[in-house]
């Protein structure tokens, strides 16, 4: 179920339901606010401020309608010096989707770039195909509209989040590409072919976007970057 919650930005963490009730992790990371987004979210600790969103991890669920509420909650927490944990059951799909929507709003980055940066420190992050489609629909225009609403309510955004996220992008790209060589190795070529196969399995049309990705393909897609990321980190 992972190795604990992941720090995405100052004041913003991503994790699973185990992390959300682990007093050691919560205390160590000074978590003050929690967004619980799964089928039956419940407040567990009296000294934590909760936002509970009931959402199942299925592609057809309209998770996008919760973006505004979650973004305002997370942003208010960070501005007031708190630390917010966003979690679902496994810390893979629902919570990642909400975190991506927030980061898009405060940085102007596209969802693919944000996901790539998150994967640099949390390789299992992997929104389901329907949630990816909703992030695509959320896009730059809607995220910047929400940003203007944040600034009207809270004032100018003081964080340097875009710089922090962009610094992570080269790391995950190098992890996927392997050691810098002009010609791909057999292993890299095989991995690329596998990734291409997985990409073809992801629904492309609006109708198909509601069809769940086969479980095996989702597992392979989720852990595609993990060995290289861990190998690179271990080599430092």
Curated annotation (Swiss-Prot):
Alphabetical UniProt keywords: Cell membrane, Hydrolase, Lipoprotein, Membrane, Myristate, Protein phosphatase
Compartments it resides in: Cell membrane
Protein name: Dual specificity protein phosphatase 15
All copies of domain Tyrosine-protein phosphatase, residue ranges: 4-144
Organism: Rattus norvegicus
PANTHER family: DUAL SPECIFICITY PROTEIN PHOSPHATASE 15, DUAL SPECIFICITY PROTEIN PHOSPHATASE DDB_G0269404-RELATED
Gene Ontology molecular function, alphabetical: phosphatase activity; protein serine/threonine phosphatase activity; protein tyrosine phosphatase activity; protein tyrosine/serine/threonine phosphatase activity
Biological process terms in GO annotation: negative regulation of transcription by RNA polymerase II; positive regulation of ERK1 and ERK2 cascade; regulation of oligodendrocyte differentiation; signal transduction
Family, per entry: Belongs to the protein-tyrosine phosphatase family. Non-receptor class dual specificity subfamily.
One GO CC annotation: plasma membrane
Domain of life: Eukaryota
Covalent lipid sites (N-myristoyl glycine): 2
Region (Disordered): 178-213
Enzyme Commission numbers on file: 3.1.3.16, 3.1.3.48
Catalysed reaction equations from the record: O-phospho-L-tyrosyl-[protein] + H2O = L-tyrosyl-[protein] + phosphate; O-phospho-L-seryl-[protein] + H2O = L-seryl-[protein] + phosphate; O-phospho-L-threonyl-[protein] + H2O = L-threonyl-[protein] + phosphate
């Amino acid at each position: 179920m992972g190795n604990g919650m992941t720090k995405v930005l100052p004041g913003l963490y991503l994790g699973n339901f185990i992390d959300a009730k682990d007093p050691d992790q919560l205390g160590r990371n000074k978590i003050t606010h929690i967004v619980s987004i799964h089928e039956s979210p419940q407040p567990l600790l009296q000294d934590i401020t909760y936002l509970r969103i009931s959402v199942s991890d299925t592609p057809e669920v309209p998770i996008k309608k919760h973006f505004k509420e979650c973004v305002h909650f997370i942003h208010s927490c960070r501005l007031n010096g708190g630390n917010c944990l966003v979690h679902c059951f496994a810390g893979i799909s629902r919570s990642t989707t909400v975190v991506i929507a927030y980061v898009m709003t405060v940085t102007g980055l596209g969802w693919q770039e944000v996901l790539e940066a998150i994967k640099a420190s949390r390789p299992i992050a992997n929104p389901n195909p329907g949630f990816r489609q909703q992030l695509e629909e959320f896009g730059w225009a809607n995220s910047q509209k929400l940003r203007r609403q944040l600034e009207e309510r809270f004032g100018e955004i003081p964080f340097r989040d875009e710089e922090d996220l962009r610094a992570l992008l080269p790391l995950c790209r190098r992890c996927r590409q392997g050691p810098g060589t002009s010609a791909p190795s057999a292993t890299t070529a095989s991995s690329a072919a596998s990734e291409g196969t997985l990409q073809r399995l992801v629904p492309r049309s609006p109708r198909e976007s509601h069809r769940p990705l086969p479980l095996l393909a989702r597992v392979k897609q989720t852990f595609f970057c993990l060995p290289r990321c861990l190998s690179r980190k271990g080599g430092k």
